[in-house]
Amino acid sequence: MNDKQIEAVEQVYYEVDYTFTCTFDRFNERIRVDHYDGNLHSILEHIQTIFTNEFTKCIVKVQREHVSYFLSMGYIVEGMIEAYYLGSDAYLMTLYNADWRRNSPSWIEEDQLLAAVRRKQASPLTEKPLMRKGTEADAEALALLYKNVFAVYPTPMYNPNYIKKVMKNDTIFFLMEENNRIVSAASAEINRTNKNAEMTDCATRSENRKGGTMRHLIMALEQELLKEKIYYAYSIARSRSFGMNAVLYQLNYHYGGRLVNNVRIYSDWENMNLWSKRLIKSAE
């Protein structure tokens, strides 16, 4: 396992009768295809050549009409993001290069946690707190927050320069402060092509996890996304995190499945739950 945090690298392949975009994520030992078009047979053959033993997981966001073909080629469905492709669903389909990556000893425990999330009555929100949009000037303080909350994180959020880079690349941050330090933050990574955004980088210092802090931040991000004409949101939450899954469930995100040993986060490899929401309905 590679212990050095390395930024993922995106590469676009343009061939005669197809194109696809692949992210090489060496820290998490995976490749991920977020967009493809053209000859499916050629695309899958090409993916097979780049899915080397350096990686243990391959993920493709598959359009609904292509699911059966991917199944016939040995891929499995791990989850679904509602309305990912301009209102059409995306199916996350996977291949593996290692048995350990495919198997999860905590699956039943995480099923039980999800059932408890559904049973839990939402606690009342506190009065809307002071929140603001993050700027590049906050990068150092945000990096300190992520270092405080996560021993391991799947992207280089401990690096202020990386935070500045994602801000420049259409990621919006909202944050809360107390005693001149950031105590909670969340971001929305915008995909303007497909009119969606990933709600991510959610972190709250342990002493500030009361009163619906993260719910307030995500609701603020949702309103900001609507201003940006982004109509669909999704999030990928740690399957072991009762609090984060409860936040998404209580904000009317729909559960869409679980990604096995998807990333290194918090302290180890973890399964991740998929959640998605059509923001248009929440604004009606």
Segments from the language model and where they lie:
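N-terminal charged segments
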Residues: M1-N53, S68, W100
